[in-house]
Amino acid sequence: MVPTRNRPMLRILGFFICAAFIYLSFRDLWLNHKGKAKLGFVKRNGTQFVVDDKPLYVNGWNSYWFMDHAVDEHSRNLVGEMLEAGAKMGLTVCRTWAFNDGGYNALQISPGRFDERVFQALDHVIAEARKHDVRLLLSLVNNLQAYGGKTQYVKWAWQEGVGLSSSNDSFFFDPSIRNYFKNYLKVLLTRKNSVTGIEYRNDPTIFAWELINEPRCTTDVSGKTLQDWIDEMTGFIKSIDDKHLLTVGLEGFYGPNSPKGLTVNPEQWASQLGTDFVQNSNSSNIDFASVHIYPDHWFHNQTFEEKLKFVVKWMQSHIEDGLKELKKPVLFTEFGLSNQNKDYEPSQRDKFYRIIFDVVYKSAKRKKSGAGTLVWQLFMEGMETFNDDFGIVPHEQDSIYKLMIEQSCRLGKVTGRLKEQKLKELCSHRH
């Protein structure tokens, strides 16, 4: 039994022990989220990305599945594990979906109705990225049907009796649907992160916003419909958030308004999609251009070597456009080689990656507009069902793993960032 005279002292001691425990428990969380509040926003200086007035060339990846996995507590850990794996390779930017419209684990259940549980999952993704010093390129809607996309918006309009057309492309011209999307944008941009306490529009963890993944508007091949939509939506975004960079999310095809580029397109069909790389990227509120690289999807009868030649020509054309026409950075936001090709060999993927990395590295050395690449896609062990023939698990293909680290080191040398501790350690042990 404790003597009565000692009880006040024990209470005081207990209080300080409890306070110390709470401090130690939450110190790392506080440092990870609050202590990095001075992280600089990525900006644009001509054809270069800059952070704190220093050039930034991107070596990154795609993991579109982050928010979806963060909803479930049993799979949430995969987000942090993937970000940690990326950071250990010196990767600096991850592109992921900030949308899920209708369907399972929907962020937006119906126009203007959001699932707080899913929003908190996205909060977690952003907080984890901040923790691992990785920035996020967040895509805002899908042109494809996966995760809802423009098709879901059109369905909503029809269900509410306000749709003008059953065409999926009415997403771009229907006033009611435009208002649906604007409402979503406003809610997302002004969202206060439940983990960090920072509004999305004020969070430098977000590298940039991507307006739409792979837009196409085949009902108007002139490109006017899509261009009007881009101009309106980018202006709306900038009126709410003028701190973050903004890109369209293009595949990079040239339209009728860019006759010189038509010879660079993979085939004639690419000019009939209602998009135009130069015109769309030249919109005044667009800060950098985006391009994809998928010769497997775009050609059916070419040999592997012919595809490699196309890739170099494709990339160089867009880099020159960025330098001379747009005067903006060009980021290759998706690239991949399918392992389901006839006569596929793992060494082909090595060659494919090497050529793409080399083009960007040479552009960076010459201070041209090639601003970086994002591999499609990376995932973790046990996620084979998410592999769309392009996916890679870090470490499983050692040659690719080493190529990605080498690119991080090469770009770090160009920018002078090799002196930064994490990159210095990574690159000094590379050999």
From Swiss-Prot:
InterPro entries: Glyco_hydro_5 (IPR001547), Glycoside_hydrolase_SF (IPR017853), MAN-like (IPR045053). The keyword S-adenosyl-L-methionine does not apply. Glycans are attached at residues 45, 168, 282, 301. One of its GO terms (molecular function) is mannan endo-1,4-beta-mannosidase activity. Pfam families: Cellulase. Its EC number is 3.2.1.78. Substrate binds at residues 97, 213, 294, 376. Residues 1-24 form the signal peptide. Belongs to the glycosyl hydrolase 5 (cellulase A) family. This is Mannan endo-1,4-beta-mannosidase 5. It comes from Arabidopsis thaliana (Mouse-ear cress). The lineage of its organism: Eukaryota, Viridiplantae, Streptophyta, Embryophyta, Tracheophyta. The gene is MAN5.
